[in-house]
């Protein structure tokens, strides 16, 4: 491809709203243009990269035995109402009405549609197993779209859905997709980790995310420094405390604490360590009641763990001060488990405390030297805290370390979550009707492009991993418009490279060499060849790899050998 026949839309200016390097570089390299908040046009250069990623995804899905189809973007409200997600999905679901006042939505995902297909088309166990996938535009009405295509409202996604007769078959399909995802991200040249994850709005019982490691990632990846354990911090388990709780020493005592509202203030007032106090958080129950969650003073609540607790509302909702005062008689800064008039759940680490401090459920008063069972019944105990870097890994091997990650894919074991609600069944070999066992598997194709840039760039621009590069070779002539020899040599080499199967971008613009070099570095083409009069005099071409700082001279007759 010659630049004169291509749309090269590089710019020097960085948009004011572009914070991440990937967003800045995708705009400057002419890959994207913003249409509206969270909506982007993929220009020809960007589309080439997007299609490269989609091609790798498609090849590996086909290799894994999945079958491609294409479902509508617009979906009937009735399907989402049937699954129970019409209201539960929240404001990210863009709801619309047609001219006949029928409700629809722009699909953020396609579990309902594929389950509807399955219940209509699948009748017998003999048709199983099956796995369908599509690569298609999705829409989620993000409250605050940001970071370019990293968190946009419209995006390209690969979503797949497996159907099996039983749980064993579903697990086998899950493992097959898990392995396919590993191959996809390995082929794309990304540094990634597969981590245990929460199932979120999709649902199901078991899930992994695929996280591209990058300092700007929104997710915290937790991993052991001595084992294969890895999880999103939302899912990371805190190891249960070891040993028996020691016996109490001091007598419980109420102290006046005027103005004390936080653990730090209590620690300063009572001269105690934060880890010797407990904090009490009030959340809403699933039947309008209130429930207290009690943690050690130096720990933070893991909202995802909490909202999966029996009796706790999903999604998690904190009670406001008015509700707390009506139920307990004090403000949020004076709460504690002693004589608490509502049910409470204690974190496992807080349950090990001896002679601890807590609110007295009376404004401006706290208890010190409180002990479980002696002064207050322990009640329910669960793992509800966020893990802390340096914690012992839950598998007992090594310590937990943290890294930042960008989620580019997730796989789920759905079981019969959708098939049961939508009555998707098949008849087994005994003639018995059974609910289909499902899995679903997503890859953010457009987000993967941005994540790759976050891992692969420098001060000059993008450094594409080879499988994602829009072109393989940049051919840059020096003063071609003044030199017949340079033009002729370029024409000959360009045709040889094309005939050899390489994707070449020939910069045939009437521009200064520095401008052309800067543009080729910015758009990140892996290999650059420079042809000049002085080089031709010596029978050489200058070769430079994008990821290298040094150029080298290559014989004009042996240029193709560089790429073999």
Swiss-Prot record:
Its main location: cytoplasm. PROSITE patterns: AA_TRNA_LIGASE_II (PS50862). InterPro entries: aa-tRNA-synt_IIb (IPR002314), aa-tRNA-synth_II (IPR006195), aa-tRNA-synth_II/BPL/LPL (IPR045864), Anticodon-bd (IPR004154), Anticodon-bd_dom_sf (IPR036621), Pro-tRNA-ligase_IIa (IPR002316), Pro-tRNA-synth_IIa_bac-type (IPR004500), Pro-tRNA-Synthase_IIa_type1 (IPR023717). It comes from the Bacteria. Its EC number is 6.1.1.15. GO terms for molecular function: aminoacyl-tRNA deacylase activity; ATP binding; proline-tRNA ligase activity. It is found in: Cytoplasm. Keywords: Aminoacyl-tRNA synthetase, ATP-binding, Cytoplasm, Ligase, Nucleotide-binding, Protein biosynthesis. Pfam families: HGTP_anticodon, tRNA-synt_2b, tRNA_edit. GO terms for biological process: prolyl-tRNA aminoacylation. CDD domains: ProRS-INS (cd04334), ProRS_anticodon_short (cd00861), ProRS_core_prok (cd00779). GO terms for cellular component: cytosol. It catalyses: tRNA(Pro) + L-proline + ATP = L-prolyl-tRNA(Pro) + AMP + diphosphate. Belongs to the class-II aminoacyl-tRNA synthetase family. ProS type 1 subfamily. Homodimer. Catalyzes the attachment of proline to tRNA(Pro) in a two-step reaction: proline is first activated by ATP to form Pro-AMP and then transferred to the acceptor end of tRNA(Pro). As ProRS can inadvertently accommodate and process non-cognate amino acids such as alanine and cysteine, to avoid such errors it has two additional distinct editing activities against alanine. One activity is designated as 'pretransfer' editing and involves the tRNA(Pro)-independent hydrolysis of activated Ala-AMP. This is Proline--tRNA ligase. It comes from Coxiella burnetii (strain RSA 331 / Henzerling II).
């Amino acid at each position: 491809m010659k630049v004169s026949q291509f749309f090269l839309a590089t710019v020097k200016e960085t948009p004011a709203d572009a914070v991440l390097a990937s967003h800045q570089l995708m705009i400057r390299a002419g890959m994207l243009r913003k249409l509206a908040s969270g909506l982007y046009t993929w220009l020809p250069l960007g589309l080439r990269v997007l299609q490269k990623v989609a091609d790798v995804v498609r090849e590996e899905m086909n290799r894994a035995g999945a079958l491609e189809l294409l479902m509508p973007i617009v979906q009937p409200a009735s399907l989402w109402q049937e699954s129970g997600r019409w209201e539960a999905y929240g404001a990210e679901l863009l709801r619309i009405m047609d001219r006949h006042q029928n409700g629809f939505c722009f699909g953020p995902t396609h579990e309902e549609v594929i389950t509807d297909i399955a219940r209509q088309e699948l009748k017998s166990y003999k048709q199983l197993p099956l796995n369908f996938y599509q690569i298609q535009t999705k829409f989620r009405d993000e409250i605050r779209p940001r970071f370019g295509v990293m968190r946009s409202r419209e995006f390209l996604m690969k979503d797949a859905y497996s159907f099996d007769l039983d749980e064993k078959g579903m697990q086998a399909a899950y493992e097959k997709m898990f392995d396919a995802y590993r191959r996809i991200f390995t082929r794309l040249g990304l540094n990634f980790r597969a981590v245990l994850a929460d199932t979120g709005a999709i649902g199901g019982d078991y899930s992994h995310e695929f996280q591209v490691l990058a300092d700007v990632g929104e997710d915290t990846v937790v991993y052991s420094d001595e084992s294969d354990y890895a999880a999103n911090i939302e899912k990371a388990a805190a190891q249960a405390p070891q040993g028996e709780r020691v016996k109490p020493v001091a007598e419980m005592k109420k102290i006046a604490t005027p103005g004390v509202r936080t653990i730090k203030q209590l620690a300063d007032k009572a001269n105690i360590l934060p880890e010797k106090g407990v904090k009490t958080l009030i959340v809403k129950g699933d039947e309008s009641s209130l429930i207290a969650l009690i943690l050690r003073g130096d720990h933070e609540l893991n909202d995802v763990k909490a909202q999966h607790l029996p009796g706790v509302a999903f999604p998690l909702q904190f009670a406001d001060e008015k509700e707390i005062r009506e139920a307990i008689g004090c403000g949020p800064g004076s709460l504690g488990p002693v004589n608490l008039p509502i049910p409470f759940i204690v974190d496992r680490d807080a349950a090990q405390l001896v002679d601890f401090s807590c609110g007295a459920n009376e404004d401006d008063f706290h208890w010190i030297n409180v002990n479980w069972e002696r002064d207050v019944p322990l009640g329910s105990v669960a793992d509800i805290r966020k893990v802390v870097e340096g914690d012992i890994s839950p598998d007992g091997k090594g310590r937990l370390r943290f890294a930042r990650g960008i989620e580019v894919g997730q796989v789920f074991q759905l079981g019969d979550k959708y098939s049961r609600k939508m009555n998707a069944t098949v008849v087994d070999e005994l003639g018995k009707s059974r609910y289909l066992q499902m899995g679903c598997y997503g890859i953010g194709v457009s987000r993967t492009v941005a994540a790759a840039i976050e891992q692969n760039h420098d001060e000059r621009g993008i450094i594409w991993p080879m499988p994602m590069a829009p072109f393989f070779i940049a051919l840059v002539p020096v003063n071609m418009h003044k030199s017949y020899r340079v033009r002729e040599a370029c024409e000959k080499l360009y045709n040889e490279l094309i005939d050899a199967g390489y994707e070449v971008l020939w910069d045939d613009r009437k521009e200064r060499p520095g401008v052309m070099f800067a543009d080729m570095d910015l758009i990140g083409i892996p290999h650059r060849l420079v042809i000049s009069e002085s080089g031709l005099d010596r029978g050489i071409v200058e070769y430079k790899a994008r990821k290298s700082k040094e150029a080298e001279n290559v014989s004009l007759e042996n240029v193709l050998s560089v790429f073999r």
